[in-house]
Amino acid sequence: MNAKPLAGLRVLDLSRLLPGPACTLYLADLGADVIKIEDEAQGDYARSLQPALFKAINRNKRGMCLDLRQTDGRATFLRLVERADVVVESFRPGVMDRLGVGYEILRERNLALVYCALTGYGQSGPYRNRAGHDVNYRALSGQLEQSGPAGGAPDLSNFQVAD
């Protein structure tokens, strides 16, 4: 049997909800060793969704809990970064820096690290700190106004394209 194309690649997944976990799911399906890292206190918000969805989006991944606000959690994460190829995170801009594990710190530990920051509106610009979820994008684009009856409340779909 042929090895999968990303076999040997290690990914640290700090993302939550759906976009980041979907991204790392594809990497895992292609053979990457993905370690999903959840906050000890809250975990991934997607755990509050249907259990089958959470399990499906996180299949083929290993998991662990770390509190990056604590010295021990940060130290463990930084040791993992030394042996990782990719870090994927979905915090608002500046959160990783405030936790003491921003790009510059991680780069000092691993010059070859690929750092992927998934945000709704990018790392700079006027909307950078806004919440970034499907309903926000639909409202901002005007699509939400076009859903539902004319002159009535918008129809909030259960199908979230961008979240």
Tell me the role of every PLM-derived stretch.
Residues 1-163:
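N-terminal helix-loop segment corresponding to the beta1-alpha1 unit
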